[in-house]
Regions:
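Generic structural signal for small/hydrophobic residues in well-ordered secondary structure
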Residues: 44, 95-96, 137, 159
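Catalytic core and acceptor-binding pocket of nucleotide-sugar-dependent glycosyltransferases
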Residues: 128-236, 243
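Short, acidic, metal-binding catalytic loop of nucleotide-sugar glycosyltransferases
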Residues: 31-42
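Active-site-proximal specificity loops/subdomain of glycosyltransferases
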Residues: 47-88
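Short beta-strand-to-loop acidic/aromatic patch adjacent to the donor-nucleotide binding site
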Residues: 87-98
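Short, hydrophobic beta-strand segments that form beta-sheet elements in well-ordered domains
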Residues: 40-49, 114-117
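Conserved donor-nucleotide/metal-binding helix-loop-beta segment in metal-dependent transferases, i.e.
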Residues: 97-128
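N-proximal low-complexity "stem/linker" segments adjacent to membrane-targeting elements
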Residues: 1-33
Length: 253
């Protein structure tokens, strides 16, 4: 499939960029703005119970019920996201992931109902994929309304693993792993030509030291999982990022 020309931002007139959050509001807005700098979308939505501050140019905020837990987030993504999406597809992002390279966009991404970074820790062929930076069709969003919610299983695992056979029986198509690796990376080593990424442990690769430190200092105290804090501490120590290392030590205390 033909990809966008180098240096050009693709016009994704059939894609809504959307973030759903109750935490890390400033970082989430930054992720939306970073994505908007690399691609043009039909609409850009921030769905949150908190009114945003700062630069919201081109972003529409819609108030939703508070998202206080991962279960709240999963329930919203499965049951209510479809109410806000008017385009055939939605690009779902979180605070720790965004579009890296608009030239890496491939129209073939739109041939599928779900595409996200492959998970390396599964070996059964159902490794696609991560929901934190994922492209989903409206058809998938509507189908998800009928899926049973099984806390504490996360919504992307419900969609892509637990109930994937049920969705495929309805004609839902999951992207092949080779295409998903070009779409995004998370826990698999990047090849350098991905459209986007997800993960706090990857965010630091794409920010200056001062920018990353500001983002992490602004996060709510319990935002990062303990393993993420250890991972970021090790990364910072190996690269001499003293400020970030001290921030992770503070969060581990």
């Amino acid at each position: 499939m033909k990809q966008a020309a180098p240096g050009l931002t693709p016009r994704l007139s059939n894609v809504t960029l959307v973030a759903v959050t109750g935490v890390a509001l400033a970082a989430t807005i930054e992720a939306l703005l970073a994505s908007m700098a690399k691609a043009q979308f039909a609409a850009v939505l921030l769905l949150s119970d908190q009114p945003p501050r700062g630069d919201m140019t081109g972003i529409e905020w819609r108030r939703i019920q508070p998202i206080k837990t991962r279960e709240d987030y999963s329930r919203f993504m499965l049951r209510e996201l479809a109410d806000h999406i008017a385009t055939p597809h939605a690009l779902c992002v979180q605070w720790d992931g965004y579009v890296l390279d608009g030239a890496a966009w491939d129209p073939a991404f739109l041939d599928y109902d779900y595409i996200g970074a492959p998970w390396p820790h599964f070996s059964d062929g159902h490794r696609v994929g991560n929901g934190g930076f994922s492209l989903r069709s409206r058809r998938l969003l509507e189908a998800c309304r009928q899926l049973p919610i099984e806390p504490p299983i996360l919504e992307d695992v419900i969609i892509c693993r637990r109930l994937r056979p049920q969705l495929e029986q309805q004609g839902i198509r999951f992207a092949p792993e080779a295409l998903a690796r070009r779409f995004s990376y998370e826990r698999i080593r990047p090849e350098g030509n991905e459209f986007g990424f997800h993960g706090a442990f990857n965010l630091v690769r794409h920010m200056s030291a001062s920018h990353a430190l500001r983002v992490f200092r602004d996060l709510e105290p319990k935002m990062l999982a303990r393993n993420e804090r250890w991972e970021l501490l090790g990364w910072a120590v190996r690269r001499g990022r003293i400020g970030l290392a001290l921030e992770m030590i503070r969060r581990l205390a």
